[in-house]
Structure formats: structure tokens, C-alpha cells
Amino acid sequence: MKFLWAALVVTLLAGCRADVEEEVKLGQEPDRWQAKQPWEQALGRFWEYLRWVQTLSNKVKEELLNSQVTEELKLLIEETMKEVKAYKEELEKQVGPIAQETQARLSKELQAAQARLESDMEDVRTRLAQYRSEAQAALGQNTDDLQGRLASHLRKLRKRLLRDAEDLQKRLAVYQAGTHEAAERGVSAIHERLGPLMMEGPLQAIPPSQQLRERAEAWGQKVRGRLESVGSQARDRLDDMRDQMEELKAKVEEQASQVRLQAEAFQTRLKSWFEPLVQDMQRQWASLVEKVQSTLGISPSTKPSKTK
């Protein structure tokens, strides 16, 4: 049994060490959101605020007990989503006509990525609001367990936030490239119509190749999206399993502590029950011995003398 507990502790410590190493790596990631597009800068401010919250310093713990943190996060979320929408509209204005099917597909993928990022940011705010309610309910008690669960959930949410932010960044790049490519195809079509008749034959072969390329790109995007979705689900499940192991360990330790306290209380209760009974039996036995000795005429303090 001790060996199993030792193996479990080693496994959990190894997981914690991996979390610390990954924490350092993720802490360096926000640099990519600096001094670029306005939406990336807004996301960078949200990220920096989240990293400050994760320190769980005394100042953070104090401010988490009121609604100031969640209100500021709400403003940062609204600012980020506003900048994303503005950037998308700017891209649409900069380019010419695009194939309706391609535009619908790219726009749908972009909206889904934007929705995932917004959901991640809202999850952070919701989790902090939940912690505030739990901490206020446990005011005056030990909140180490609440802080441990909050830190674990924030690590998980931050990894998901980074992953979906990178996905949105890629989708915007694909959207920009797709619209620019459509504009270039429009220029090529004008050259085709105004070109000499002798070039008409070769130019007519271009549209089918472009259609094939569009289909290949669409198929590639679909496959890549599915692979990313599967990978994301696998990472989320691993994170869930790790969180469940941590919660299970905490519950087992708590139950073991309760069992130990109950056993000690039961032992004390048994002692309080039987100790008076034993003392009473000792008194009764001593009294019985005295009565027997008195009846036989034997003094309890002297031995009977031998008669000659």
C-alpha cells in the first residue's frame, strides 16, 4: 500500500514539474501580441492582466474578493472583440470581389475561431467570479484548497486561450491571403479578356486549374481544421484527467484525515466508557475481599500464626 502511495506521489510531482516548465514557456508567449495589430495588442493587455491574477499575491487575493477584477476583464474582452471585428471589416474593404463559396467558407471559419476565443476569455471571467463567491462564503476559514483549484483551472484556461488566439491569428492570415488572391485573379481575368486572340486558348485553361487549386485548398483547410480539433480535444482531455487526479488526491487525503480523527474520537469515547467500569469493578472486588477476610477472621494486614 505504501508503495502505491509513493508511486502516486511521484507521478503527481512529475506532473507538477511539467506544469511548472510549461508555465515558464507559456509566460513568454504574450510577446507575440505586442506592437502588431490593434486586436493583438488588446489581447496582450488581457493576457498580462491574467498573468498578474495568476500570481495570487496578497494584492490579487484582496481584489478578487470584489467585482473590480471581473469588471476590468469584461472591458478587456469587449475591447478585444471590437478590434477583431474592425480588423476583419478592414480586410474586406481592402480587397475586391471573391468567389462566394470561398468567402462563405473563410468567413465561417473565422467567426468560429473568434467565438472560441471570446468563449475562453469569458470562461476566465466566470471562473474568477465563481472563486469570489466561494471565497466570500468561506471568509475566515482556510482558503488554500480554493486557491489551489483556481490556480489549476487558470493554467488550463490560459493554455486554451493561447491555442485559440493562435488559431484566430492563422484564420485571419488565411482570410487576408484568400481575399488578396481573389483580387489577383480578378486582375488576371481582365488581362485574359483584353489579351490577343492567339492567347485565348492557353488563357482558357487557367480557370479550371484555379478551381482545382481552390478545391485542394478547401480540402486541405478542412482536414487541417479536423486535425486541430482532434488535437485540441485530446489536450483538453489530458488536462481534465490531470485535474481529476489532483482533486482525487485532495479528496483521498481529506477522507484519510477524517477517518483518523474519527478513530481517535472513538478511541477516546471507548476509554471514557470502560475506564469508570473497570474502576468500579476494582472497588467491588476489593470490598468483596475485605468481607471474606472479615468473615474468616483474617486481618488483611497480618498473616495467620501457626499453632504448635
UniProtKB/Swiss-Prot annotation:
**sequence repeats mapped onto the chain:** 75-96, 97-118, 119-140, 141-162, 163-184, 185-206, 207-224, 225-246
Q: Where is this region: Lipid-binding and lipoprotein association?
A: 205-281
Region of interest (Specificity for association with VLDL), ranges: 269-281
Q: How is it modified after translation?
A: APOE exists as multiple glycosylated and sialylated glycoforms within cells and in plasma. The extent of glycosylation and sialylation are tissue and context specific.
Q: Where in the cell is it found?
A: Secreted; Secreted, Extracellular space; Secreted, Extracellular space, Extracellular matrix; Extracellular vesicle
Task: Read off the InterPro entries from this record.
Answer: ApoA_E (IPR000074), Apolipoprotein_A1/A4/E (IPR050163)
Q: Which UniProt keywords apply?
A: Chylomicron, Endosome, Extracellular matrix, Glycoprotein, HDL, Heparin-binding, Lipid transport, Lipid-binding, Oxidation, Phosphoprotein, Repeat, Secreted, Signal, Transport, VLDL
Q: Which residues form the signal peptide?
A: 1-18
Q: Which SUPFAM superfamilies match?
A: Apolipoprotein A-I
GO molecular function annotation:
cholesterol transfer activity; heparin binding; phosphatidylcholine-sterol O-acyltransferase activator activity; phospholipid binding
Which parts of this chain are annotated as the region LDL and other lipoprotein receptors binding? 153-163
Query: Where does the record place the region Homooligomerization?
Result: 257-308
Gene Ontology biological process terms, A to Z: acylglycerol homeostasis; cholesterol efflux; cholesterol metabolic process; lipoprotein metabolic process; melanosome organization; phospholipid efflux
Question: GO CC terms for this protein?
Answer: chylomicron; extracellular exosome; high-density lipoprotein particle; low-density lipoprotein particle; multivesicular body, internal vesicle; very-low-density lipoprotein particle
What segment(s) does the record annotate as region 8 X 22 AA approximate tandem repeats? 75-246
Main location class: secreted
Q: Where does heparin bind?
A: L157, R158, K159, R160, G220, Q221, K222, V223, R224, G225, R226, L227
> How the protein assembles, per its UniProt entry?
Homotetramer. May interact with ABCA1; functionally associated with ABCA1 in the biogenesis of HDLs. May interact with APP/A4 amyloid-beta peptide; the interaction is extremely stable in vitro but its physiological significance is unclear. May interact with MAPT. May interact with MAP2. In the cerebrospinal fluid, interacts with secreted SORL1. Interacts with PMEL; this allows the loading of PMEL luminal fragment on ILVs to induce fibril nucleation.
The family this protein is said to belong to: Belongs to the apolipoprotein A1/A4/E family.
Q: Function of this protein?
A: APOE is an apolipoprotein, a protein associating with lipid particles, that mainly functions in lipoprotein-mediated lipid transport between organs via the plasma and interstitial fluids. APOE is a core component of plasma lipoproteins and is involved in their production, conversion and clearance. Apolipoproteins are amphipathic molecules that interact both with lipids of the lipoprotein particle core and the aqueous environment of the plasma.
What is the name of this protein? Apolipoprotein E
